[in-house]
Amino acid sequence: MASWLPETLFETVGQGPPPSKDYYQLLVTRSQVIYRWWKISLRSEYRSTKPGEAKETHEDFLENSHLQGQTALIFGARILDYVINLCKGKFDFLERLSDDLLLNIISYLDLEDIARLCQTSHRFAKLCMSDKLWEQIVQSTCDTITPDVRALAEDTGWRQLFFTNKLQLQRQLRKRKQKYGNLREKQP
């Protein structure tokens, strides 16, 4: 299953804690953890310092407490935990699926589960709030969608339409018909 993973599993950059101005890059590939740094200093003795790089296999990174400490210091404990999990072979396959496939999967979830999923990451929040998802949900829950309802959904959004009760929906459709009916009468 891991064979379809890209060569680069994770990449991030960061700056050292103050007062340091040094830059760091952490790159996790299928087989290695690559840690790069660039010393930034106004002092003349450090101006000729060349960038550095440390390459470790996943197994070696798991045993290298110094490199793990540096990773936690620069990038934070959550990034360190994520990298350790990648090194142990615990991949986040769900996060790597295409948006269309995820939208199809999410459309089968209960509303409470969609609300919880929305809180897990920025990507899932964007997907859970997308009109594409709510259009799928409305189509699966309604027998037929009239052209008037579809036009209203295009104006207000499918999510808004889904959470609108039937009485409000009828009133909004009536207002929309009156509005566009008046516009048609005014046209020569």
From Swiss-Prot:
Annotated InterPro entries: F-box-like_dom_sf, F-box_dom, SCF_F-box/WD-repeat
Any one annotated GO CC term: SCF ubiquitin ligase complex
Entry keyword annotation includes Membrane: no
Biological process annotations from GO: SCF-dependent proteasomal ubiquitin-dependent protein catabolic process
Highest rank taxon of the organism: Eukaryota
Keyword line: Ubl conjugation pathway
Domain F-box as annotated: residue spans: 91-137
UniProt-listed Pfam families: F-box-like
Function: Substrate-recognition component of the SCF (SKP1-CUL1-F-box protein)-type E3 ubiquitin ligase complex.
Subunit note: Directly interacts with SKP1 and CUL1.
Protein name according to UniProt: F-box only protein 36
Gene name of the encoded protein: FBXO36
